Amino acid sequence: MKHIEYKPFFAALLALTVIGMAASVATLGVRADDNEAITFRTRLTGFGEVPPKLVEGSGTFSGELSADGQSMSWTLTWTGLTGPALVAHIHFGQPQNTGMPVVFFCNGGNRPAPCPDGPDHSGTLTGTFTAADVVAVPSQHVTAGDFAGFVKILRAHLGYANIHTMQFMGGEIRGQIRVGRGDEN
């Protein structure tokens, strides 16, 4: 029977794990590579909420980080809500968990109020996020104005967009934001 040396095997495995983790952390940087725009997207539905909601409403969010990493142009759309949108924002939270808002699309922060309400309780908002839009969330160690931190949250897939209504004050539709390049995601 052949004797196997486990120490070198586990040392190599540990080294590969550390290298892999370092590479993963390196991808959480803020800047786009060589002026290539980084996009963030999600589809909002009631199934994304915590707890999930069986509702007809849906929406989309898309954002594009500027080449210098200092701003993000964005569009948020929704339709079919149970009533007018009361507030819409991006939270810092994992899938299946909740967190606090870090930026607002409407009706909070320094965004216009109220949120638009069109036919079938629909709406579209466009704008640009900058450091001035990031609000403090002391319980999650987010500092007001920390745009680089906000982008790190999104790149780590720890941001979600959601829209609240009178019937669903905790949120009617939600989508976890993902990173994509170009038309991906």
What is each PLM-predicted segment?
Residues 24-185:
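N-terminal leader/targeting pre-sequences
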Residues 12-24:
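Bacterial N-terminal signal peptides
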Residues 2-15:
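Bacterial N-terminal signal peptides that target proteins for export
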